[in-house]
């Protein structure tokens, strides 16, 4: 990191001019509340704990009204970047979505999300096979984020190396009505209509949005439409119902990744092989869910049912992939949150059905070729049961323990039998324990935990057999993780500080690793064993009611300990930087609100052999807006934003172990945007 970049990053934590701070703060600011650990129930662990008392690393981040209205929020990276322990890669096109990893878990994913359980408004986006697609999530309406950084299979089973719980609204509340428009560099445009209120006995919240871009890179044009909402009501003094709906439709081009030489010479170019077949994605997804809570007096019984339908056409240079997916599930939980002994019991069931067809080629128009290479029906069945107990040994000391049993069955019905019937099954089972303790120090909390996670290969990973063909890859098995952590969180009220720190070690056996063959197809195997050691720290200083300074540090050492290829032993796990520093300063004064943020990332490896690296960078973003100008019953909230202020050339994402050294997915140069909210 150059001296200039380091100096710029350091200035982010320096106060703005004292004359600004000396002016009167906005009357809506609350001074004392900023430095207290909130008693927020952590829904990401099925309401078993609160943020202040949890015996594991968890962050609950509630986005302020100013952040929701006055920042661009076009990508989940904008929402998740301030959180420690999570690594988000933004590809800056719609075809593949963000690449998300928590403590190194999920690093192998080059499309979708692996290894991290994701829920949106209480409904799982993670499928029974362990993969998640976040297309339906509109970052512009996400109001609260819960991130459990510890392995959490005891609560959610398959693919729970961490838990990400996203909420567009809080139960029983509805945001103001607003129309929002935003335009910016590279043909970016976004429109949003959002509103809510009471409709008879219902409290409702709904939104609809459209987004399009020409894109910084060639062949990255696309559009997407989203809609969703929640509705809740009481069915009696002890019973509450909440319904959730979300939908997405998109049509986008895919520029693919570049070699280092291409990245250095012209990062805006696209891979010619993808342009030649008009590679991209056309998809739609709809999901619906409902949760019913009933208070039994000292205990709560909760039941949830949900369903999802996703349709995909995916033209690529080596194949044209088409599938229709149906998925759904139920969960039932009984929990007790009073008394010396607390805890819960639950059962889950899930079903996933993928009707998959792969054509062996794609035409220059982006349509499927004539020959079918794979035609099969893939079914995933998942059943599980779990229990969790918390024993409050004293007023300050609590002990916790949990256990979950899962069984998952994958079935492939081969409907293309010219080369023989390759139908097959894979069945996996797991027992996931956890134990922990927490100690209340008065102003903070000490905690320690041992927890576990397991992660099966997904249906698409099993169907990507080396050499092609139907059925499932019989050589790749689940990976299993054991996690150890200690930490502390709390406040220093006199100094108006809030802090959070944790040390952890993950031991990963039978690590599922991805590599790309010559045609560009992802193929998977078990690498062997990794260790992930790390530290995470957060500090937030509410200097005045109108000035907040925050710092986040994530340090890690992820090492390949065992491998079938002995030359890889001792190498660093690719795709994840060893350090990440995030800083921001927020100022609110006389109706104006501004944020200056920065993220520093060193170079990091892009392949298992550690022979190639993504370049280091410092990313600085600036936003300025007004919190409300009243005009004839309407409130106007304008804003402007500058991203990549330093005009860095960097890779927003990487493709781990890509064939031919095509690791790099470039991010845009300096860009500008402006928007307006009209609120009533």
What are these regions (language model features)?
Residues 344-441, 456, 565:
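Signature of Gram-negative outer-membrane beta-barrel scaffolds
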Residues 296, 300-314, 440-451, 477-533, ...:
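Membrane-embedded beta-barrel scaffold of Gram-negative outer-membrane proteins
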Residues 337, 394-399, 407, 498-507, ...:
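Gram-negative outer-membrane beta-barrel transporters
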Residues 183-212, 217-255, 279-298, 328, ...:
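Transmembrane beta-barrel wall of Gram-negative outer-membrane proteins
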């Amino acid at each position: 990191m150059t001296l200039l970049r380091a100096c710029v990053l350091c200035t982010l934590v320096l106060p703005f001019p004292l004359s600004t701070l000396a002016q009167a703060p906005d009357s809506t600011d609350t001074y004392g509340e900023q430095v207290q650990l909130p008693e927020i129930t952590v829904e990401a662990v099925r309401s078993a704990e609160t943020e202040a008392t949890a015996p594991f690393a968890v962050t609950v981040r509630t986005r302020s009204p100013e952040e929701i209205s006055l920042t661009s929020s076009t990508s989940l990276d904008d929402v998740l970047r301030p959180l420690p322990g999570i690594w988000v890669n933004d590809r800056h096109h719609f075809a593949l979505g963000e690449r998300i990893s928590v403590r190194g878990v999920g690093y192998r994913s080059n499309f979708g999300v692996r290894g991290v359980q994701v829920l949106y408004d209480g409904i799982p986006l993670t499928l029974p096979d362990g993969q998640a697609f976040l297309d339906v999530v509109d970052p512009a309406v996400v109001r609260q984020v819960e991130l459990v950084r510890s392995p959490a299979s005891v609560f959610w089973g398959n693919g729970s190396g961490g838990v990400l719980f996203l909420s567009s609204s809080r139960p029983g509340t509805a945001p103001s009505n607003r129309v929002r428009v935003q335009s910016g560099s590279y043909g970016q445009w976004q429109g949003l209509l959002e509103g809510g209120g009471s409709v008879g006995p219902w409290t409702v919240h709904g939104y609809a949005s459209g987004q399009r871009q020409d894109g910084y890179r060639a062949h990255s044009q696309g559009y997407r439409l989203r809609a969703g909402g929640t509705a809740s009501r009481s069915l009696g003094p002890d019973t509450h119902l909440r319904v959730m709906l979300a939908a997405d439709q998109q049509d986008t081009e895919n520029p693919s990744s570049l070699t280092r030489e291409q990245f250095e010479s012209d990062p805006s170019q696209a891979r010619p092989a993808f342009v030649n077949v008009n590679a991209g994605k056309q998809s739609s997804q709809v999901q619906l869910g409902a949760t019913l809570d009933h208070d039994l007096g000292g205990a709560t019984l909760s039941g949830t049912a949900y369903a999802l339908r996703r349709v995909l056409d995916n033209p690529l240079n080596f194949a044209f992939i088409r599938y229709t997916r149906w998925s759904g599930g139920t969960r039932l939980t009984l929990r007790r949150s009073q008394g010396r002994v607390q805890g819960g019991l639950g059962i889950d069931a899930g079903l996933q059905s993928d009707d998959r067809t792969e054509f062996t080629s794609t035409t220059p128009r982006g349509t499927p070729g004539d020959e079918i290479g794979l035609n099969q029906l893939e079914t995933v069945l998942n059943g599980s049961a779990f229990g969790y107990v918390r024993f409050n040994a004293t007023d300050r000391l609590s002990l916790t323990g949990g256990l979950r049993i899962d069984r998952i069955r994958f079935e492939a019905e081969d409907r293309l039998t010219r080369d023989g019937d390759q139908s097959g099954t894979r069945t996996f089972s797991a027992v996931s324990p956890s134990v922990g303790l927490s100690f209340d120090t008065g102003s903070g909390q000490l905690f320690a935990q041992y927890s576990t996670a397991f992660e099966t290969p997904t249906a698409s990973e099993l169907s990507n057999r080396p050499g092609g063909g139907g059925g499932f890859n019989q050589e790749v098995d689940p990976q299993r993780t054991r996690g150890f952590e200690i930490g502390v969180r709390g406040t220093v009220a006199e100094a108006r500080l809030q802090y959070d720190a944790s040390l952890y070690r993950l031991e990963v056996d039978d690590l599922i690793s991805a590599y790309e063959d010559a045609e560009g197809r992802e193929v998977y195997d078990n690498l062997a064993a990794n260790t992930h050691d790390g530290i995470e720290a957060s500090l937030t200083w509410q200097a005045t009611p109108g000035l907040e300074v925050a710092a986040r540090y994530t340090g890690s050492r992820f090492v390949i300990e065992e491998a079938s290829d002995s030359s890889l032993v001792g190498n660093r796990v690719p795709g994840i930087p060893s350090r990440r520093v995030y800083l921001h300063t927020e100022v609110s004064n006389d109706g104006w609100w501004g944020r200056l943020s920065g993220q520093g990332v060193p170079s990091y490896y892009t392949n298992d052999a550690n022979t190639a690296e993504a370049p280091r960078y410092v990313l600085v973003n600036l936003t300025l807006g007004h919190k409300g100008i009243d005009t004839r019953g309407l409130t106007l909230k304008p804003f402007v934003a500058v991203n990549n202020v330093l005009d860095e050339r960097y890779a927003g994402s990487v493709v781990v172990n890509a064939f031919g050294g095509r690791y790099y997915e470039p991010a845009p140069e300096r860009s500008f945007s402006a928007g307006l909210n009209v609120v009533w």
